[in-house]
Amino acid sequence: MTQKEKNETCIHATVSGKVQGVFFRESVRKKAEELQLTGWVKNLSHGDVELVACGERDSIMILTEWLWEGPPQAAVSNVNWEEIVVEDYSDFRVR
């Protein structure tokens, strides 16, 4: 395992609160691209937002902190995330 591989991780996260209809997914995509992360983000039918993000551990930690803020119109009440097996995505997409 290379040093780069040791420093990379993926997370699966669910964000709750007023996170749909407030440009949350697009804001996550922009933040992820800014942090050079790959993965995806999508709305869930019950009102939460789900995402998978992969990249350098420091960038992932910045994203997990940012998820509590989101875009100005959002009102985040909870963020649950866990590390998962590293997956290989070519970019970050809104689903």
Swiss-Prot record:
PROSITE patterns: ACYLPHOSPHATASE_1, ACYLPHOSPHATASE_2, ACYLPHOSPHATASE_3. Keywords: Hydrolase. The gene is acyP. The keyword Acetylation does not apply. Transmembrane segments: none annotated. This is Acylphosphatase. One of its GO terms (molecular function) is acylphosphatase activity. It is an enzyme of class 3 (hydrolase). It holds the Pfam family Acylphosphatase.
